[in-house]
Amino acid sequence: MSYSVQNIRNVCLLGHGGNGKTALAESMLYLTGGTVRLGNPADGNTVCDYDPEEIRRQISISTAVAPVEYNGCKINVLDTPGYFDFSGEVIEALQVADAAIIVCSAKAGMSVGAEKAWKLCEQRRLPRLLYISKTDEENSDYNAAFDTLRERFGKNIAPVAAPIWDADKKVIGFIDVLHKRAFEAGPKGERIEIDVPDDKKPVLDELYDALKESVAETSEELMDKYFSGEDFTYAEMIQGLRQGVKDLSLFPVVCGSAVSGLGTRMLLDIIVELLPSPLEGRPLMGENADGEVDEFVPFPGALPAALVWKTVSDQYGKYSFVKVISGNLKPDMQLVNSRTGATEKLGRLYVMKGKKAEEVKELECGDIGAIGKMEKVKTGDTLSDPRKVVKLEPIPFPEPCYSVAVTPKTKGQEDKIAAGLIRLNEEDLTFNWVNNAETRQMVVSGTGDMQMDVILSRLKSRFGVDAELSEPRVPYREKIRKKVEVQGRHKKQTGGHGQFGDVWMRFEPGDTEELQFCEEVVGGAVPKNYFPAVEKGMREAVVHGVLAGYPVVYLKATLYDGSYHPVDSSEMAFKTAVQIAYKTGMPQASPVLLEPIGELKVTIPDSYMGDVIGDLNKRRGRVMGMNPDGEGNQIMEAEVPMAEMGRYAIDLRSMTQGRGSFTFRFVRYEDAPPAVQEKAIEAAKAMQEEAD
């Protein structure tokens, strides 16, 4: 069944890991006939957590789509991971969602995940409501949870439901404030109306009056009616609430239990009645054919355009998940990829329900679906009609902040790892990797240790390669501290033409990181045509220092004398001679190891400042300054040796309960302390022995 854009809702579930987002999606599917049984994440049988890694770990790793059909509307529920390592999946979902539901637990109340979700919605000006989950579980406390939300997010959060407890403080139902009715959940999660308990009638009146006041503030007409003492009609209540949600002046709060189905149907009603359709949602920014910045709002009658917001690429094939921004999509359409300029022929179209792909003949404007086998299309691409090429804004993925070295357990499988990483990177753009020739390691950088562990597991399960993780080697440098003069003489007689090259070199500290090569030869002691060979020999030599084999920097090398043989001298002989001089002279020039220093910018709430500064001191860091960001956080700038930053992403997350973030960039090299030099030299020797 197809739906017009007015009857589509694209809603992402956000919140802390373990708060019940996947269970809520499962409840919505089950109660609307989308599934025949209610899945449970702990049993590994849910629609949204279908990946083997998700089933094994009992957490969401990827965003999954759960299309829910309810009261003539299609609700595309985007179930996102709550663990911070998989924040890229959340960013993808937010790019195409028209509203969000922030899920908070009645057992835990306010959480870091809810704070982060709220902030992400604020940055995008995304309409949202809050759902307090697990209200019927032991040790749950709805009132305490609501109070923490009100304290953190302000008086604009408005409860449209409230739980009903029995004498033993067990939740048995809920009050629907908007309709002034009460319900309990039946054995299959169905909604059964009950009388509003006498002790809840004052609560209902109080909540309804508060809701009326919030509605009155959405328009002058409703405000006048409110102050005249007139009651609002149901239509006016819906109109006001819908407007308040749209302009971000009102954030409804719903409660329930995904397991029992309590409150799920009311949540569906709220989604349909109050949350915006794609026509009313946040416009996407981008560029038109002339390169001008423009806003793009879904419009059914326009030429087709779609955003590729997610990619799934596994052993079963490749699906490019899209949101139709304008027009509609049909198989075999010819659309331009704005990134490459190439025209792409669309493959088969699908509506996804978890891993299940249902083929459709058309994707309507505003809808979310997938295109099969688009091998040259990547996440973030815009596909549009050649007559009106559109390029939507890139998806703002987080920068990698945690790096590890990946090594195959069986030698010779490096290419297999690289091929696997290429495929995995199609699905997850929050990590990258490089083959570091200097440290002889394949270094993968991403968001955290859990993400790296998942990558390792998928390399084994999907591509059959066993790998292990280790800390990346630090790219040290070497320099000298004093001037030396030394001879390098290469003489070899093998019958016939021999080999002869003789140079006198002066090595001294230089002014620039790159090698400074000079010549001061007088009288033709070394002919000029051999100067390039001497310089080439030096540039090859400085790649490996004499202390630990690291590149040499800040070196000035001057050729000032030497001798040659008219027959036996050659470019190769002089190149060899200067390298002999290098190996002889550099140990005499007081070589020292340099370590890379980076600029660290940490954003943290004020309350964690002491812990973070204490931790930086242990890392040999130097705090350079602090500035408030206007949101109750401090931005602290520091300089820290790169060698001390290996697990900083994990440690900062632990110190701040996930509230801290940071950026780190290399700025310069400086002398390493003696203990660091000694350790690095020993490690380099061990690495060389292993290579030999």
Predicted segments, located by residue:
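Structural and coupling elements of P-loop NTPases
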Residues: 1-692
